[in-house]
Amino acid sequence: IGMQLMCLDSEEGDTRCLGIFPAHVVRLRGGENPLKIPHVGWDTVGRLRSPLFDGLGEDTYLYYVHSFAAQACDATIAQTDYGGIFSAALGRGNFFGTQFHPEKSGRAGERILRNFLKL
């Protein structure tokens, strides 16, 4: 929920947020083939564009639990596709947020947290 609060607004409760990231938070739709919502479990992350992801490759698996997600924007530093592309992580200046749970994402999550401490 922390990353979503730093976005412009959210469909969840039709809420204005802090506006640090230029992204709108929308309910996951599930795409052409209905997908299970909430999105719970392991999924890949790609388009890694930050030192936060040093040492990780494209299509690294991370753990998600969510029904809403930030749309991709110019602050997107990682993305995931679950019935459509959404921001898996956002970064701007010294602000970072992740949609996935690094604390539940095993070694990859540990690496991300260690990288964060080095920024």
PLM regions: where:
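A short, polar/proline- and glycine-enriched secondary-structure boundary/capping micro-motif
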Residues: P38-G41, G46, S87-A89, R107-I112
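Acyltransferase
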Residues: T98-L119
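Residue-level signature for short turns and capping positions that connect secondary-structure elements
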Residues: V25, N33, G83, P102-E103
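Active-site oxyanion/phosphate-handling segment shared across diverse enzymes
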Residues: T44-P102
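Short linear Ser/Thr-Pro motifs
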Residues: L8-S10, S67, S105
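Cysteine-nucleophile active-site neighborhood
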Residues: I1-H39, R114
